Amino acid sequence: MAHQAHAYHMVDPSPWPLTGAIAALLLTSGTAVWFHFHSLTLLTLGNILLLLTMYQWWRDIIREGTFQGHHTPPVQKGLRYGMILFITSEVFFFLGFFWAFYHASLAPTPELGGCWPPAGITTLDPFEVPLLNTAVLLASGVTVTWAHHSIMEGERKQTIQALTLTILLGFYFTFLQGMEYYEAPFTIADGVYGSTFFVATGFHGLHVIIGSTFLAVCLLRQVQYHFTSEHHFGFEAAAWYWHFVDVVWLFLYVSIYWWGS
């Protein structure tokens, strides 16, 4: 390896951005094909390619940051800014869903019966499963903060316990959301209410799955002694993402489940 007289990481050529982009194309087009033609082939291929890309890209970053020492303080600063900008872009992504929901609900058209929820729609009780889901996610926010403080204080066992609990709560939330979808008295095809409900809560559910995976990787790394009290940005980024998912759910709960019902 050539000598470098600066603290910045010159990244080696990598195939993973390309394979990740192809996986994203297959996932989005595969979802459309699944909706319209009931074929899961493209969606399955996209998922397999995405999982392979995630595994190998994360593996390479761990090698560069943990074992080769490329993640110097200036590089970590850049990663922090990158994560902040990514979460900001996600805020605007969800803002679009809230905009669609409020556009439809604040001035319902005659086609909807001039009321919200639209005529013929039976809404979900906000004080049953949705309230339980809120409690589960808020509890997971507490446990991920516990894990963060444990890492900073060098409490290895407590970090593992707190991370495990957070991941289990994330999986429990996903299970409850899946049951709610299965038993819902309306579908994504039931007009603007069904589409805004399932798209907004569905994308949030997808983010919970992504966040749970992110935290699971952090748990494996913690077990392998990758994190120290000074060097643990991989976990910090996962914790920021998880808190973002928590906050989005609170807005979804208040807007769609409680006010919207």
Swiss-Prot record:
Residues 1-15, 67-72, 153-155, 224-232 are mitochondrial matrix. PROSITE patterns: COX3 (PS50253). Residues 35-40, 106-128, 184-190, 257-261 are mitochondrial intermembrane. GO terms for molecular function: cytochrome-c oxidase activity. The keyword Transcription does not apply. Pfam families: COX3. CDD domains: Cyt_c_Oxidase_III. Keywords: Membrane, Mitochondrion, Mitochondrion inner membrane, Translocase, Transmembrane, Transmembrane helix. GO terms for cellular component: mitochondrial inner membrane; respiratory chain complex IV. Component of the cytochrome c oxidase (complex IV, CIV), a multisubunit enzyme composed of 14 subunits. The complex is composed of a catalytic core of 3 subunits MT-CO1, MT-CO2 and MT-CO3, encoded in the mitochondrial DNA, and 11 supernumerary subunits COX4I, COX5A, COX5B, COX6A, COX6B, COX6C, COX7A, COX7B, COX7C, COX8 and NDUFA4, which are encoded in the nuclear genome. Belongs to the cytochrome c oxidase subunit 3 family. This is Cytochrome c oxidase subunit 3.
